[in-house]
Amino acid sequence: MTAESMLFNGAILSIVLVLVGLAWGFLLLKIQGGEAE
């Protein structure tokens, strides 16, 4: 595994983690907002 492929995989992993984190946070906010109403 070359350094370039490691950087590429790391970048993809970071983006995926950020997207999952945003989706999870949005889902929790939506659930909490629904219960509050």
From Swiss-Prot:
Membrane topology of this protein: Single-pass membrane protein
Asked whether the UniProt record includes Repeat among its keywords, one would answer no
Q: Which InterPro entries match?
A: PetM_cyt_b6/f_cplx_su7
Q: Where are the transmembrane segments?
A: 11-29
Its domain of life reads Bacteria
Care to name a GO molecular-function term for this sequence?
electron transfer activity
Report the main location listed first in the record.
membrane
Picking any one GO biological process from the record gives: photosynthesis
Q: Which Pfam families match?
A: PetM
Q: Which residues form a coiled coil?
A: none
Q: What keywords does the record list, in alphabetical order? A: Electron transport, Membrane, Photosynthesis, Thylakoid, Transmembrane, Transmembrane helix, Transport
Q: What compartments host this protein?
A: Cellular thylakoid membrane
Please provide one cellular component term from the Gene Ontology annotations of this protein: cytochrome b6f complex
Q: Which SUPFAM superfamilies match?
A: PetM subunit of the cytochrome b6f complex (SSF103441)
Its function, per the record, reads: Component of the cytochrome b6-f complex, which mediates electron transfer between photosystem II (PSII) and photosystem I (PSI), cyclic electron flow around PSI, and state transitions.
> What assembly does the database describe for this protein?
The 4 large subunits of the cytochrome b6-f complex are cytochrome b6, subunit IV (17 kDa polypeptide, PetD), cytochrome f and the Rieske protein, while the 4 small subunits are PetG, PetL, PetM and PetN. The complex functions as a dimer.
Which family does the record claim for this protein? Belongs to the PetM family.
The name this protein carries in UniProt is Cytochrome b6-f complex subunit 7
Look up and give the organism this protein is from: Gloeothece citriformis (strain PCC 7424) (Cyanothece sp. (strain PCC 7424))
